[in-house]
Each structure stands twice: as C-alpha cells, then as structure tokens.
Amino acid sequence: MSSNQELVVLGKLGSSHGIKGWLKITSYTDSVEGIFDYSPWLIKEQGVWREVKVAQWRFQGKAVVAELEGVATREHAQMLTNCEIAIMPEQMKDLDDSEFYHRDLIGCEVTNINGYNMGIVDQIVETGSNDVLLIKANAKDAFGKAERMIPFVPEQFIKQVDLQGKQILVDWDPDF
C-alpha cells in the first residue's frame, strides 16, 4: 500500500467494545462523526497498511464505536487496538479558497509584511476561538526567539497564504 507520509491520519482505533469485534474510535476530525464520511479507511495491521470498511457505527455514551467489515471477534478487535486510521490524500474534501487543512500549513515559511523571516510553521494549536500557528524561529533569529505563536486570523494577522510556494505572509511584529 502507501507509505505513511502520503497518508492523512484521521484518528485511531481504540479498545474493543463487546464480544462481536466492535472498536472504540478516536476521531481527529472536526466533528467526532466526521471520520465516517471517509471510506475506505487504511489501517496498519502487523506493519502493513490495508483497506477496511466500516460496516456500521454508533454513539455509545460519549464514545463512538464501529464495526469493521471482517472483524467479528473481540480477539481480532483487540489486535487492532491503537492502529491509526488513515486515508489517501485524494479522499480529502475540497475546501474553499479561504480554508486550509492544518497539514498543508505545516512546513510553510512565515514572513512578515516588512520582509522579516519569522520561521517555519511547526504545528497548529486549536484554542477554541481561533487556531494559532506555532512558528519555529530560525536558529539565528535577530530577536532571540526560539518560537512564535501567531493567531490564524485572516486579514487581521494572516495577509496571504501561498500553499504552492509554501509561504505565509503575516502582519506581526517579530519581537512579539
């Protein structure tokens, strides 16, 4: 199948639930049930990625559980515990021009409107009100910063995003 780097990880399989092979699901999608909008899933079982399809799923209290095709026993389900759930990138939904997947922003070079290179996006932190770019500063940062946190607020702080060129233009003081 595909290498791990090409895949988009959407969640992971949790512990078994019941005796018929159901599994708890940890979803990294915006809504917990959003993970079920994608099919087939890829899971890494014994070092090999393979396709699986969800036969059915449901909410179980605050958790989400699913039955996977071909997994009919508790023992088989237990062997899948902690396996990542991934999809191929082409399965991702198309976004509007003003929307971005976090994975596409990671690795972008961030420059402020005065031309100062702020560093590289290392991760995105979800705060509830807006996402925040965690920027790993250059080793020889003139302001002695190791990292910066810039709110991802289009127009106010984020002036331009060029995914092809892996560039983000921001209105942000490098000393802040």
UniProtKB/Swiss-Prot annotation:
GO terms for cellular component: cytoplasm; ribosome. The keyword Chaperone applies. It is found in: Cytoplasm. Keywords: Chaperone, Cytoplasm, Ribosome biogenesis, rRNA processing. The keyword rRNA processing applies. Residues 97-176 form the PRC barrel domain. InterPro entries: PRC_barrel-like_sf, PRC_RimM, RimM, RimM_N, RimM_N_sf, Transl_B-barrel_sf. Its main location: cytoplasm. GO terms for biological process: ribosomal small subunit biogenesis; rRNA processing. It comes from the Bacteria. One of its GO terms (molecular function) is ribosome binding. Pfam families: PRC_RimM, RimM. Binds ribosomal protein uS19. Belongs to the RimM family. An accessory protein needed during the final step in the assembly of 30S ribosomal subunit, possibly for assembly of the head region. Essential for efficient processing of 16S rRNA. May be needed both before and after RbfA during the maturation of 16S rRNA. It has affinity for free ribosomal 30S subunits but not for 70S ribosomes. The PRC barrel domain binds ribosomal protein uS19. This is Ribosome maturation factor RimM. The gene is rimM.
